[in-house]
Design a protein with these regions (language model features):
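A structural signal for small-residue-enriched, beta-sheet-centric alpha/beta enzyme cores
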Residues: 1, 34-138, 150, 154-159
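Active-site acidic/histidine clusters and adjacent loop/turn architecture
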Residues: 1-19
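A generic alpha-helix structural signal
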Residues: 13-20, 71-72, 121
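Short, hydrophobic/aliphatic alpha-helical segments
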Residues: 15-41
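Long, acidic low-complexity intrinsically disordered regions
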Residues: 138-144
Length: 159
C-alpha cells in the first residue's frame, strides 16, 4: 500500500509502481495471475489489476443527515463507491469524511482506475457544492457555488 497526504493520486501510483517493480525483480517471487481475470487476490472485488485506489473526501453536505445515502446516490452514476474511512461496513466520519474508490476494478488498467477516481471525485465535489447551495443533503446536480464543504482530505491510497 502507498499513501500520500492531499490529492496526489499520480505521485502515490508512481511510488506503488516503483515498489512493485522492485518486488517483481526478486528471484523466486511471483504474483498469482489468471489469463482470464488478471491478478488473483484474496478479495474478489480486487481481481484484475489487484489494485484499489481511494481518496478520503470530506463531503459534509452530502452526508448532512449523518448517513452516506445521498453520497452513495451521487457517487453511483459516476462509477464510484462510498464507504466509511475505516473500510467496508464502517460509519462515515462525524465531519462527513468518506472513503471514495472506483466501483469497477476488473478488465480495466491501473491508469484507468486512477483516472476514473480523479475525474469522478471532481464531479462528486461539484455535487457537494450543489448540495451546499441548496441547503445540504440530497444528491445535488451539476455545478454551482455557494456554501463550502467538499475537499480532498487527509490522504489518498493505492494498494
Amino acid at each position: 500500500m502507498c499513501m500520500g497526504k492531499g490529492f496526489v493520486l499520480n505521485e502515490v501510483f508512481d511510488r506503488l509502481h516503483t515498489a512493485l517493480e522492485v518486488v517483481e525483480s526478486i528471484e523466486g517471487i511471483e504474483f498469482a495471475t489468471s489469463k482470464k481475470y488478471g491478478y488473483v487476490t484474496s478479495c474478489p472485488s480486487n481481481l484484475g489489476t489487484g489494485m484499489r485506489a481511494s481518496v478520503h473526501l470530506k463531503i459534509p453536505n452530502l452526508t448532512a443527515d449523518g448517513t452516506d445515502t445521498a453520497a452513495k446516490a451521487a457517487a453511483k452514476p459516476l462509477g464510484l463507491s462510498v464507504r466509511g474511512t475505516g473500510g467496508e461496513h464502517t460509519p462515515i466520519g462525524a465531519d462527513g469524511t468518506v472513503d471514495i474508490s472506483p466501483s469497477n476494478r476488473l478488465f480495466i488498467t491501473e491508469a484507468e482506475i486512477v483516472t476514473k477516481l480523479y475525474n469522478g471525485i471532481k464531479l462528486l465535489l461539484e455535487k457537494e457544492q450543489a448540495a451546499a447551495s441548496s441547503g445540504g443533503g440530497g444528491g445535488g446536480g451539476g455545478g454551482g457555488g455557494g456554501g463550502g464543504g467538499g475537499e480532498a482530505k487527509g490522504c489518498c491510497a493505492v494498494s
